[in-house]
Amino acid sequence: MRYTYEHMKSMLQGAYKKLKSYYFYDKTLLFIKKKIAEFESDDGCFQQTFDVLAKALISENSAYFEELINQLDYRVFPKRLVAASAPTSTIVGTIDHHKNIAKVNFFIDVPIELLILDCLWTLCIAKISNKKYGTQACSYAGKFKASVFYFDQDDLYEGIDWESNRCFEPYYENYSRWQKDAFSKLRQGLQVQNQLMLSLDLKSFYYSVRFEFDSLSALLSDDSRLSEISFISHVEEKLYLSYTKLISKYKKGINIKNNATIFPIGLLSPILLRELYLYAFDQKIKFALNPTHYGRYVDDMIIIIPAEVQANNVTQNYVCNLLKEKGLIRKEISIQNEDFTFVGFESIAIQREKINCFYFEQNASNVLIEVAEKQIRDNSSEANLLPEFDVIKNHFNDIAYFFNSVGGSTKIRDIGILQSNNYAASRSITLMKQLLKNTYIAEQDRGKIEKFINDLLEFYSGSSAIEFMGSWTSVFELILQLKVLSDDKRKRDPLAQRFYRDIVYYIDYKLTFDLLDPKEIYSKKKATVFRRLKRDLKDRLGTSIAMAMALDYRWKATVSAQKKNIELAKKFRKSNIFNHNLVSFPLLNYLPFDKIATRSLLEIQKEPWSDSGVFSLDTQRPFWTPRFIHLDELFIYYFMQSTQNEKKNFNGKSDIEAIWKRYAQLNSVQRFTTESVAKQNSMELLGVNINLVNVSILNDVPSKYYVGLPNTTVSEDDALQSLVDPAHKMTIHDKEQLFRMANAAVKEGANFITFPEFFIPIVWLKDLTRFAQKNNVSIIGGLRYIRNANRAF
């Protein structure tokens, strides 16, 4: 390859930063998070890997990559669980915790070197594809952040940001926009005539696709830059072909022809290749239907078209016939098969029973739109508010379950099936953890929280634990948080033991393939896949425990694997692959690892750094950060540093400018920032000279301002008592009072919220700064005294 060693190494390191950030936020691929943690555990091997990779690429060392591809393997996890018994007319008053596996998902498992190479190749192909495709408006998933590419540079090295960890836009924002845009276009269409909204999904898309690497040249218009990465493309093709061959031994329906491949779940490249592959597919649908709106999120489509028939004629058959008339689909030959394949994309299919139709009348009150839009708005606004104590006072069961009643009726005869709401359950866990953070849990509160967790463990018992395995880490974090903040001295935690043993028991004795869809796995391979699935589930369980323990090692969750869990937890902490939101003080986990290797990251930092030498950011840890380091975190960090390093005061101008430059450097955003954000002047007020610092604000400012004045006081005794007793007024109730006042002020439209002097503990400041940022408000308040040995600030 034509790149120098220095350029190639820089590109590989940049690619690694981006893949690390992507998997940091991913909740599915815990085995890759573990792979990253183990990769960074040995500093020498970690750095050497980039050297070896760079030299192998420059010399186009095929044997080296052949050896890596030979280590290819797969992971397998449950995709869908179903009830063992057939539905009856009897309404059962309990949740079915005895479901079993109907479908599975396969994930690619490769050495970290191939993950890095895959990310590097993905970035290069994305840069090349920008020239032809730009931003695809109708596709909402897998979008690259605009800052990843320099559009005035065609060169693959100069034209890609290899310094930062930025890569994809947050999935939840695009998913929400996918829904909001659909309803917005629907409203516009209803101003003209009745509208029909169709919801379609592509059947087993990642396994059904037949991608050929030879098609890349045509897809990218024979771009000359493809030749620069032809060797990497060749390695990628061999990897895809090897994985396709491997999975086809187990999963039915993968009939390989020529050099076609499926898309490996677990790599970053399919996110991009999927969009290139479906570009013509999207255009064909838009041309054939001329829809009011067309939006696709991965393999889910929302299509809005003018309604040409009456509501009672809109059925799944009508939709299928319409798509056939437009030349988009054709029925499979098999009489029993209800699948329809897309013309020109014969490997891609939709299922009749999964077609959803919604009819909207032009001049009618379309309540469905209003309810859906309200739900989207509420989810967004709720996420901006601080959690309140209702999350404890309300029983967990009130949140996590609902009846699928007939018409919302409260009559006994209309009560439907009791169902689980995992979204509400997982959200309540997150809110509880945020509320508990940096509080002293009194005995009476501990009992309430234990009741909450016991209800939670009942919710996740039996098959529900397997079905919602994405919540394992979060549950263990909450249990550990309760143990640490309530100063529980017991060696073993009964709540953690219960959760762990319940999961292991179901895996060992209850989980089966008896209900497996006959189209999933070859019968001769079922036993092999099932053994692998059980092994992978147990490995995921151990990884979930270790990720929680990265916050505090003292917790003994299991007996047999205790030493193994702690060793892995240390690796997660060293690589910073764990939940940063629960770290007690901003950027504590970015200090030199030898200084924090054994410290609890959950305990409240009473006198955090009386040893001033500890309080300095590590030189390498921020460089390999998996996330964006926020400006408010740096302000709080450096403010605390000024109190711990015997600095007399915090200089309003020079310190702010220094922090701003540090912020830009840490996040590689120098090209987006201004030279200076702070200007200093002074004025005299009542005979006192006051220094003023003007900080540039780029956000829109309102024409009128409203000030929220919380009705609370701080006594002199309260202010002084916090010096003697750090736990003074640091309970859940005190934190909830602060949060409730802030929420109430925002709901009333306040732009400024003022709290009294000596009111806000500095360890709660991050919650408030993030709240202010999300709600575009300013918070003014006095901090409680800060201790440093025998000094107070």
Protein language model regions, located:
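Conserved two-metal-ion catalytic palm core of "right-hand" nucleic acid polymerases
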Residues: 1-232, 256-257, 313, 511-512, ...
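N-terminal, active-site-proximal structural segment of metallo-dependent hydrolase catalytic domains
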Residues: 20, 27-46, 677-752, 759
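Short beta-strand-to-loop capping motifs
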Residues: 109, 303-307, 361
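Phosphate/oxyanion-binding active-site loops and adjacent basic polyanion-contact surfaces
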Residues: 113, 117, 269-278, 445, ...
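Conserved polymerase palm-domain catalytic core
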Residues: 183-298, 304-314, 349, 414-571, ...
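C-terminal polymerase-core module
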Residues: 309-461
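Charge-dense, extended regions
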Residues: 521-691, 698
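Catalytic-core segment of enzymes that process non-peptidic bonds
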Residues: 757-793
